[in-house]
């Protein structure tokens, strides 16, 4: 997303906020099945179809210079990872917030670390500007539970059931959207802002059970 915004020279037109969303809030600390099997089970699809979907996501990542290895990801509960992110965000340093998110992505998608493991979270937290004691104290508490749940409830209310998802000017874009399609969305949002009507409601993207599309004039 940000690479595309830089290409379009529109980074200064948007403000960013990271939101929490767990695909499986009831997941165990470490799952006994891999991502391919998990997706097949969750979305009631053949294992081979699930594998191809993951390969497609890996391909999209590589096109953006990201070394995704989803097929060997270690699944586990991500709640504490979200709490850690919220904690770092609360300290008001955007760079560290972005850093912990990138570290978590790298740990999960590329290094295939178990991000429910407290030792992993402590190490990542330290790299993102926290002390070991800070992270240990956070993990031993219930702090930032409310903040994570509020983000998730907001996502559910918008019809979100998977990741990635983006909310651009209150419009939801779900799924791994191809670059050209995302480019079209971003430029359309900016154009709509410029020609916003008197009622203050721009044209935008509509999402329903069939996917996301632009409103017809």
Language model features with spans:
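C-terminal cap of thioredoxin/glutaredoxin-like
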Residues: 1-10, 85-217
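Structural alpha/beta surface segment adjacent to cysteine/selenocysteine redox centers
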Residues: 2-108, 201, 213-214
